Amino acid sequence: MKVAISGGGTGGHVYPALAFIRELKKVHPEAEFLYIGTEKGLEAGIVKREGIPFESIEITGFKRSLSLENIKTVMRFLSGAKKSKQILREFKPDVVIGTGGYVCGPVVYAAAKLKIPTLIHEQNSIAGLTNKFLSRYTDKVAICFEEVSDSFASEKIVFTGNPRASEVVGVDGEGALEAYGLVSGKPTVLVFGGSRGARGINEAVEAILPEWNKRDFQLLYVTGDVHFEKIKDSLGEMNLGNHISVQPFIYDMPKILNAVTLVVSRAGATTLAELTALGVPSILIPSPYVTANHQEYNARALEKNNAAVVITESELKETDLMATVDAILTDEAKLNSMKLSAKQMGRPDAALKLVETVLSIMK
């Protein structure tokens, strides 16, 4: 069996692809894979480190308004589709999967024109431009949020969830908090703003640290590498208690997520898939800097189901974040209700469901 996969630009498109590959290998250990991405996207480094064969094409995204740059983008798309056809003819895959990002546009389009079975995976609650375009040509569209179903033909939709969810379920969180100087068994809040951190979240947390110092529950505050030294210096005279741990980055996030009580974070699709798979309540602060404001749409889907509280970044300064945390952690009924709601939204079997869907279109 040969499988070609394309997706990139951000980790949110790459990590679901890798989770799918790992799951398919369990069922078909003999399967061969080829990843098609760009050299400029995150996928180049991540995929190569995984030891997966990698081919690259050149492509940029369409602007959401009329632009001369879009003419160049069309030319790059056609060139990318031509190169993709060459790559696919040589590799001869049984199926081609797109996990989002501009790069999968020419790849999946080329595969469809070559009559190769195709599937695209939409991680967000609002469809990306590339996936909207590709859905006309693909055999199936795998989705993670019911809210996005109106963007695609109903007969093509399969609700699989995000395969990254499957990778956090069953991970042992024992000892995870101790590695960061905290204690197991105590209510613990994890705050993080993504791999690079988020200035808005950092500023809000710094403002309430004196109050947090008076609380019994623990805080694992992940600043992001870029912000760590500056924040560490500013906290030098605050005399934080042992129940507060400030870190630049967390490398064992699946273990940590299995050990914490509440999460304060952005609302990227991968993060939400992990939180719901584990039934972890959250306070979500969507990034305002993403395409089509898709993180807020993602967050509102959880809020609507009582799995999260949403605070937009523009509301952060007027919102008492400490009071929001207190309201959840000091109300056991509310906390348990949010846990249950998050768990009900989760798809811990997402990777297997996606594998089954892919295998079905190959028959």
Swiss-Prot record:
Can you supply a Gene Ontology BP term from the record?
peptidoglycan biosynthetic process
Q: Which NCBIfam families match?
A: murG (TIGR01133)
As its record notes, the protein acts as a catalyst of: di-trans,octa-cis-undecaprenyl diphospho-N-acetyl-alpha-D-muramoyl-L-alanyl-D-glutamyl-meso-2,6-diaminopimeloyl-D-alanyl-D-alanine + UDP-N-acetyl-alpha-D-glucosamine = di-trans,octa-cis-undecaprenyl diphospho-[N-acetyl-alpha-D-glucosaminyl-(1->4)]-N-acetyl-alpha-D-muramoyl-L-alanyl-D-glutamyl-meso-2,6-diaminopimeloyl-D-alanyl-D-alanine + UDP + H(+)
Q: Do you know which HAMAP family this protein is assigned to?
A: MurG
Q: What is its EC number?
A: 2.4.1.227
- Location in or out of the cell: Cell membrane
The Swiss-Prot or TrEMBL record annotates one GO molecular function as:
undecaprenyldiphospho-muramoylpentapeptide beta-N-acetylglucosaminyltransferase activity
Membrane topology, as annotated: Peripheral membrane protein
UniProt keyword list? Cell cycle, Cell division, Cell membrane, Cell shape, Cell wall biogenesis/degradation, Glycosyltransferase, Membrane, Peptidoglycan synthesis, Transferase
Gene Ontology cellular-component terms listed = plasma membrane
* Record-listed UDP-N-acetyl-alpha-D-glucosamine binding positions: 10-12, 124, 195, 250, 295
**Biological role:** Cell wall formation. Catalyzes the transfer of a GlcNAc subunit on undecaprenyl-pyrophosphoryl-MurNAc-pentapeptide (lipid intermediate I) to form undecaprenyl-pyrophosphoryl-MurNAc-(pentapeptide)GlcNAc (lipid intermediate II).
Task: Give the pathway annotation.
Answer: Cell wall biogenesis; peptidoglycan biosynthesis
Source organism of the structure: Listeria innocua serovar 6a (strain ATCC BAA-680 / CLIP 11262)
> What gene makes this protein?
murG
Please give the name of this protein.
UDP-N-acetylglucosamine--N-acetylmuramyl-(pentapeptide) pyrophosphoryl-undecaprenol N-acetylglucosamine transferase
Top-level lineage group: Bacteria
Family that this chain belongs to: Belongs to the glycosyltransferase 28 family. MurG subfamily.
Q: Which residues form a coiled coil?
A: none
